[in-house]
């Protein structure tokens, strides 16, 4: 091997190493650039999609508000219908500045504190304790609600709450009132029929039957009165004689004791 060839080979090896190193560096730079481009495109697409969704949501809300505000203007008026040709509705597309505008409720809610950080108290209605109806009429207790004046409440209690009657009205009182033809005074016989008493005050005869009481009761029907007509007449005459007989006896005794 000649010394010239040896020197040539020695000079080739460093040059090949240099070219290989340069090629590797170029490949690494290209790969890094591609990765960066992919990452940038992904980030841009993500932000673009989020911005587009936000803009579409805002435009839908704005369109809904505009539709609600101009709902009466979508239909032609009576004058245009009577004229024959309705006026065309002009649609103006939203401007790009309106699309990017932030709605006011978001601006308000951004600076408002949340519930745990509220400084003012919540205005709740006052607690009212109502009565359950078990207390006496003045309602002495925790009840703090007064719907009426005290005088008016006392008057209502006085008018609505009354004592029971002093006597009990029996069927015999009704029979006496119907036979005598008028109202009778309060009965002192404690519910015993007038036919059961004689002039001496002792009981004579049985009490009136159910048919007699129903026949002489003022609320009975006309047919029942017709069917029990003779019996009612007999009862009337018997009651009349039982009331008149003591009076006649007293008059006779007076005549005997005081002759003319």
Swiss-Prot record:
Domain remark text: The PPxY motifs mediate interaction with NEDD4.
Role this protein plays: Functions as a negative regulator of TGF-beta signaling and thereby probably plays a role in cell proliferation, differentiation, apoptosis, motility, extracellular matrix production and immunosuppression. In the canonical TGF-beta pathway, ZFYVE9/SARA recruits the intracellular signal transducer and transcriptional modulators SMAD2 and SMAD3 to the TGF-beta receptor. Phosphorylated by the receptor, SMAD2 and SMAD3 then form a heteromeric complex with SMAD4 that translocates to the nucleus to regulate transcription.
Swiss-Prot/TrEMBL keywords: Endosome, Golgi apparatus, Membrane, Repeat, Signal transduction inhibitor, Transmembrane, Transmembrane helix, Ubl conjugation pathway
UniProt note on tissues of expression: Expressed in brain, heart, kidney, bladder, ovary and adrenal gland.
Transmembrane parts of this sequence: 21-43
Keyword Transmembrane helix belongs to the record: yes
Reported effect, residue 210 to A: Abolishes interaction with NEDD4
Residues on Cytoplasmic side: 44-260
Lumenal side: 1-20
Compartments where found: Early endosome membrane; Golgi apparatus membrane
UniProt keyword annotation of ATP-binding present: no
Short sequence motif SMAD interaction motif (SIM): positions: 164-167
GO BP: negative regulation of SMAD protein signal transduction; negative regulation of transforming growth factor beta receptor signaling pathway
Compositional bias annotation for Basic and acidic residues: 248-260
GO molecular function: R-SMAD binding
Stated family: Belongs to the PMEPA1 family.
Disordered, as annotated region: 60-98, 218-260
Protein name: Protein TMEPAI
Short sequence motif PPxY motif 2: positions: 207-210
Skewed-composition ranges (Polar residues): 220-231
């Amino acid at each position: 091997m000649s010394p010239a060839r040896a020197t040539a080979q020695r000079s080739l090896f460093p040059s090949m190493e240099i070219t290989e190193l340069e090629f590797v560096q170029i490949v690494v730079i290209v790969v890094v650039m591609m990765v960066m481009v992919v990452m940038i495109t992904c980030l841009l697409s993500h932000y673009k999609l989020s911005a587009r969704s936000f803009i579409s949501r805002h435009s839908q809300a704005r369109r809904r508000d505009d539709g609600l505000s101009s709902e009466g203007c979508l239909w032609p008026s009576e004058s245009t219908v009577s004229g024959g040709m309705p006026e065309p509705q002009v649609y103006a597309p939203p401007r790009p500045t309106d699309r990017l505008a932030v709605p006011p409720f978001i601006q308000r809610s951004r600076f408002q504190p949340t519930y745990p950080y509220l400084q003012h108290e919540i205005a709740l209605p006052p607690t009212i304790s109502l009565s359950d109806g078990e207390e006496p009429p003045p309602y002495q207790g925790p009840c703090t609600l007064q719907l009426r004046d005290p005088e008016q409440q006392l008057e209502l209690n006085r008018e609505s709450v009354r004592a029971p009657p002093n006597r009990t009205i029996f069927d015999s009182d009704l029979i006496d009132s119907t036979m005598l033809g008028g109202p009778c005074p309060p009965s002192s016989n404690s519910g015993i029929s007038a036919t059961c008493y004689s002039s001496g005050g002792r009981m004579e005869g049985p009490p009136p039957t159910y048919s007699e009481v129903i026949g002489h009761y003022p609320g009975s029907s006309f047919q029942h009165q017709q069917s029990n007509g003779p019996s009612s007449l007999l009862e009337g005459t018997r009651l009349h004689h039982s009331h008149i007989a003591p009076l006649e006896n007293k008059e006779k005794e007076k005549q005997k004791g005081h002759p003319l």
